[in-house]
Amino acid sequence: YDKNLNSEVQKVLDDNFGEENYDIGHLFAYASNGGNGDAGYVGSVCQNGTKGGAFSAHSFQGTTTDPFLNDHFDIDYVTHEMGHQFGAFHTFSFRNEFEGFNSEPGSGSTIMGYAGIVGFDNVQRHSDPYFHYHSIHNINQYIDNKSCYLSVVNENQIPTVSADRDYTLPVGTAYELEATATDPDGDTIYYCWEQLDSGQVDAANFGPYNHLGAQARSLPPSLSPIRTTPQMEAVLEGNLTIENPQTGGQWETVSLVDRTMTWAVTARDRYPASEGALGRMAFDIKVLKIISDAGPFKVTSQNQEGILWEAGSKQTLTWEVAQTDQAPINTKFVSVLLSTDGGETFGTALLSSTANDGEEVITVPGGISSEKVRIKIVPDNSIYFAVNSNDIEITPAPFVLTFDRYDQEACQEQVTFAFDFEIFSDTDQSVSLSFSELPSVLSAQFSESQLTDADLSGTVNISGFENLPAQDMILTLRAEGQTLTRSIDLEVKIREDDFQEIQLLTPANTEQEQSRTVSLSWTALQNADQYKVEVSESETFSSFTLSKTIDSSSTVLAGLDFST
């Protein structure tokens, strides 16, 4: 041994076996000074003069208090160096090798990373036993350009996988990546989501302000097609961003700056290896554009400790819309979900497709007794989401009365509210319904005014609104049982079809020499809930440069042409 194992191993193999008699050579060696390995070249299989020059060596003793396992040698060294021989580049990013594949933060954690040997930049102490998306494609590309291999028929069929469409997301906001896959053989599929953006990212510069490189580590394949970024544990703790991560730490962050992120999903069918049948894989790509014009999207209510809700009570939820309702994200509607297991699952829908306006009132569902309740708000058109930051406790109630809607618009003589009634007590419950201080000109008719059945649906019909002027009014319904009395506010917006002429307040009518940004305001009408604003360069309004519907009696027009 002349201190150059690469050249000596190559020579020994060629001299003793003949270079025409092997495709890859690799020496397993003992090293008294710990572990090391060297493939000699990236891409040497079937290359005469280099295909036998790789080695892996180790003292087979642990460098920490952890017991050393031969598996660590097999994965961290042998498989890593063989990966190089088959054309795979490094995937770590604690330093940049400018090949376009440094996509794992710090040391990385897959086979072609340097897990456990780069000090403060270590993601973890040893490699996980799988190849990164980049490594698989490096190897496939290398093999495809070689002819020394023997082709065999693989009876196992390739699965198909979809990463879904690309998305534009708000900054500072968690998101979920979800794949769908099928296997023609019915094999079990394992999913692995990995970020593909290359660039130097070590522990010192890892964080939410990077425009390039990795912001999320690779995680081992799992049966779940969903990857939450950051992981749900961090989201529930409110740790969406992290800087200077430690070994064994999070190594995942959302972005607080504009950037583009490319993700890949690898679907492995884990087919049991046998002669003529080996496991197969499929891949797909997803691109995320993060924009600072929107976000962070976050829940702003139920974030303090010690919150107690009673089943059947009405609670107000608030969230920061943060321009997510505007282009290019365009989330007009969101859904509100509830978890009773501390955020592991969100199996109860509180609201579906409600307006993304930052505030909603929900009725706490019955049949729940939990100290680990969380609220999750998800857009109907995207993959980002927000969760409140503290557990809520829900205590049971003997009965729950909920309405499909708690507000109605009365343009006619009467309105109807539909309700559902449930009993959650072991004792007999009889609940009577009545209104508190109903105006004398109004009358209420209940389909069921005495509720005794455990589960029933009914209606409340209120008439006489033609006797009242246009206004918004609150009617308080009392549901009185043996052990609980609950008051429920129902809002009625009384409207007439008598619309007065709108008077422009600012700017003055026919006033000229306005700036390109104009503040419009006009007299508010009692019977109007919305107004349509149209801007045209034509006196006949035959075409429009702007047309929008708003809820208030003022708006700002920005970026107008000088000729408008």
For the regions a language model picked out, list residue spans one by one.
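Long beta-sheet-rich domains in secretory-pathway and surface-associated proteins
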Residues: 159, 190, 206-361, 366-498
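Extracellular (secreted or membrane-anchored) zinc-dependent metallopeptidases
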Residues: 1-266, 273-282
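Pro/Thr/Ser/Gly-rich low-complexity, intrinsically disordered linker/stalk tracts
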Residues: 497-527, 562
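A short beta-strand segment in extracellular, disulfide-stabilized domains
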Residues: 173-181, 315-318, 415-420, 517-522
